Amino acid sequence: MDKKAIKTFAIQARRSLIESIKLKLENLGITKDGVAEKMSQSTNEIEYYGDKGLSITGQDIRRRRELVARLKGMAKQEEWSDALTDLIEEVAYTWFNRIIAIRFMEVNEYLPSGVRVLSSETKLKVPDILREAFEIEDDLGGYSVDEHGIIQKALDTEDPTDMDAAYVILFTKQANALNHYLPELFEKTDDFMQLLFTPSYSSGVIKDLVDDIKEDDFDVDEGGQVEIIGWLYQYYNTEPKDAAFKKKKYLSSDIPAVTQLFTPDWIVKYLVENSLGRYWIRVLHDRGDERTSLQIAQSFNWQYFMPEAKQDEISTRADLSKKRVEEITFVDPAMGSGHILIYAFDVLLQLYQSEGYSRREAAQNIVERNLFGLDIDRRAFQLTYFAMMMKLRRENRRSFELQLHPNVFEVPSTSLELKDFSGAKDGSPIDSGNLSDVLGRFGAGKELGSLITFESSIFDDKLINKIVSEREAGQLTFEMSDQVNHQWELRNLIRVGKALSSQYTISVTNPPYMGSGKMPKTLAKFVGKYYPASKSDLFAVFMERLQHLTKENGIFAMITQHQWMFLSSFKALRERMSSWPIINMAHLGTRAFEEIGGEVVQTTAFVVQKQKLQGFIGTYERLVDFDSQKKKQQAFLTAVQNPNLNYVYRTKQTNFEKIPGSPIAYWASKKKLELLQYSSYRLQNILSAREGMTTGNNALFMRSWHEVQFFKISFLSTAHQIERDKTWFPYNKGGAFRKWYGNIWYVINWKNHGEAIQSNIDKKTGRIRSHNYNGKFGFREAITWSAISSGMFSARYSPTGFLFDSKGVSSFANDHTTLLFCLAFLNSNSSSSFLELLSPTMDFKIGQVLNLPLAKQHSPQVVELTESLISSSREDWNSFENSWSFTTNILLTNIAEHHRNWTVEAAFQQWQKEADDRFNQLKANEEELNRIFIDLYGLQDELSPEEEDKDVSVRRANLPRDIKAFISYFIGCVFGRYSIDTPGLAYAGGDWDASKYKTFIPNKDDLILLTDDDYFGDDRDVMTRFKEFLTTTFGSENLNENLKFIADALGKRGDSSEEQIRAYLRDDFFKKDHLSTYQKRPIYWEFNSGRNGGFKALMYLHRYDRNTVAMIRTKYLHPLQEAYERKLVQLKKFEENEQQTRQKNKYKKQITTITKELDELIKYDEKLQHVANLHIDLDLDDGVLVNHAKAQADTKILTPLK
């Protein structure tokens, strides 16, 4: 199955259908602005609408009125524009579903007429339904005289226009005729829908489907599956889902799109075979079948069945020897497009056949007795219904005549109330209360779906049964005619309610995933009240619901996100789950779904017996380290054949209780369990930890340190003495994986002890928005770590002087030595192995970290090694300019001893050796620490001290990165931020000190041009300055060699080294490197005239003043404009005099380029003049984002910070 082609088709089909429908609506005078009146020239026979004055006649006039009435009715419940959008979506998906269904039926020869509708069996361009229109007239319900004439004319002339007209009639009749056989999918077409869709076999969705999706993907005899319907549906929803995901909170209408995820085929098989299949194996064993469970599974070809672990003595299970296959009920309460139910159908068919049933009889029983499903999404319900009917049709050619209705349901919403039923007044208070309860629970059915619960006895209520049976008995007593509709609606509610109140032998689902923060209000309130243990996410709520839906001694199976296994917010749910034994779990981790990349969705599939079995040993397949869906699948299949592999674990659930928080850490060794359970000495005995501050508005109170003026930052504050004249204070805020030292990016406004932060009031609530100031812990030396990580845990030493954030947890000890010992342990692989059990979700809570067992011996060697590791990590961090302790570029560290007569390549090789030495020494020291702690904890059989290079935090040399850092340092020197003569920052706000610059003098103006050529030959040109800088630092003798080395490292195109470096500075320096180095808070801003690049230049933020833009216009833009004009004149002369065509064309191309640049400069000059006249002042305390926007005054004169 070519899923890429399927996805492309489905997405494009939706777009095409929607655009076509919008256009037809506009032609009918219906737009987002409302409904247009018919034009004055209209008559009773013909009406004109829209800007184009298009006409409609006959039945189309009536259809338009129905359409308008439908829209106005919808608009009573929502805004007009929303009603119009919803109707467009409804019409689009209605026709999409029908087209897909017809395609599946025609390929598999399931259409009652036996004639293809969308294509030709003999590969003709014209569909067979046109060629055989009169042969199948009875199948399509007959033709009117007019229809007969149109079809006959088309067959006679074969004119494309006539053929199209006939095809519209035939296609629509076929869709309506299928209503008799498949009423839930092919509902009787509302007449207005025919106005909004014109089927065509020669272009559009139908043609694309036939041409682009392989026929074999639909053909069940050629390996095709009805599951293709599910894939098409998921991909059809791609764009609505992407749009909904961007919302902070979902609407009820978003729920289907954001929660639909088609389950991979092998996971469906795993879930069904290990629940339904396992249950039947128990039946056979109780009947006396002596084969092993694996042998029985293999006899059915259940490849994904995993036998149970060998058990100690456990509680007796219920006897299933008398269980008949007809009695097994199977439910999917979040069925989507029916993937799980369809495979359950296949398995049940095997079971029936093994019991002696014919396939035909078995299929009818399965549909009528065994399978049940529910969903809130009508489209998904229709597709599941269709898929079930197709499975039935495959086994029984006469199934359409049986008028069977599979037990799959759309959970509806209703606005009905007790007062809508006249018969309700005759009921007792209890009966009336029951009816009111039923109606009330379905009030938000479209949001709550299968989460709605009932006591089954409620449907024995006399009043309810009286109302729903009255029509059948011919005793219609309604006082109002529309109460007939109410009765039918109530009957549907009762059918769905009975399905929701029932319990089932087997319950299996892939539930919707939705965090509580994004739930619509009604849903969030409901789960908070009725599912408090699992309210954090919808998937967890369904875990509880599945337990309730499953009969005692039954089995339920799911695939969910794996957070419930570990997070403290799901501890109550884990306690509830502990009542039932986990028979098997395939812990999938990331990338279990090929449609979802990255580390976001981590999943686990599991099978649970709803029977209390003391001491049950579950089997767990740890597939998290296999990095693709296919590899996980293969690893599981391998484990079935060889269950003794090192990623297959067996353990009792009672073992989880030995671990703090009781996570489902099935891979915990006996030794670690003992340490976690019995250790009396833990980190919490010697460390105090605090979750840090929440400012309430980081955008207002927090900055990257380089954004503000350096002299305003406090570096000397302690817990006992705070620098009162400073505004900004160092602030720990977690960050990426890094051990020992670093991730020092931020400062926070703590002026006057955080006066601004502590007085920031939420206007809505009247409360202070910030909290957790941790006053007595502020500015103390600490261990800090990132609360959330995308990888391993890493802790860092934080010297005195820092405040800390909620995402940068800090912990404190009574003395320096103890702090370093704890830091050493936290960064050891022993600690990591414990944290994998306590916090596998990479969300490192304080309680989990402080619960780590701690060895009592405080080795002096550990402290000595830790001091060395911190020192090495600090040296590495300070080697680059994103550190405020940066002194000089790594390639210039040793130039003095070479008397500035060296090559850049030699300098790089020296740095490379230093970096490698530091890397290797740090790695060796970390491995020595690992060895010490492994010995202290007795984990020699489980861990080895060796460390992978990727887990070493310090950096090795990297030629492209380090050359770019050198160029960045050069830019800093040009602007005076750095000086060759002054270590560290020379200027970052405050008073300019010219004495700091002797060897290389910064530009007088706060600008350096980034042009494609040297137009001035002075310090306005970036390459002129760069060559001067290279000559100053490395000597003139090596200039060309150094330029070539740098150019080669950058890898840009160009005819010379200078051209390559110039191209990098002009095209890549700002957008590709500076923005990322400074985390989208750049200190150098790029002036940019637009797409043609007529004017590009860098400015240093800290040197900006209110006259900078005016200076740029007069001293740089205008002279550059004149230079362009001179060059243009010169090029035109060259072009006129040139005889060779190739060179002449080259000149023409250059003339076109520079002409575009000049035109762009003229427009840009207007923008600059506007901004210059405003004389805008910036306050660096406001931060880069605010100032970057402010400096442009609603124009676009700077490159965006993207």
Swiss-Prot record:
Disruption phenotype: Loss of whole genome N(6)-adenine methylation in the fifth position of the hexamer 5'-ACRCAG-3', no visible growth phenotype. Has a higher plasmid acquisition ability (when plasmids have the methylation hexamer) but a reduced ability to retain plasmids.
EC assignment: 2.1.1.72
InterPro entries: BREX_1_PglX, MethylTrfase_TaqI-like_dom, N4_N6_ade-DNA_methylase, SAM-dependent_MTases_sf
EC class name: transferase
Top-level taxon of the source organism: Bacteria
Keywords: Antiviral defense, Methyltransferase, S-adenosyl-L-methionine, Transferase
Catalyzed chemical reaction(s): a 2'-deoxyadenosine in DNA + S-adenosyl-L-methionine = an N(6)-methyl-2'-deoxyadenosine in DNA + S-adenosyl-L-homocysteine + H(+)
Biological process terms in GO annotation: defense response to virus; DNA modification; methylation
One Pfam short name: Eco57I
Gene Ontology MF term list: site-specific DNA-methyltransferase (adenine-specific) activity
Family: Belongs to the methyltransferase superfamily. PglX adenine methyltransferase family.
Physiological role: BREX systems (bacteriophage exclusion) provide immunity against bacteriophage. Part of a type 1 BREX system which protects against dsDNA phage. This system allows phage adsorption but prevents phage DNA replication, without degradation of the phage DNA. Methylation of bacterial DNA by this protein guides self/non-self discrimination. Probably methylates the adenine in the fifth position of the hexamer 5'-ACRCAG-3' in genomic DNA. N(6)-methylated adenine on the fifth position of 5'-ACRCAG-3' is found in the genome; there are 1906 sites in the genomic DNA.
Protein name, per record: Adenine-specific methyltransferase PglX
Organism: Lacticaseibacillus casei (strain Zhang) (Lactobacillus casei)
UniProt gene name: pglX
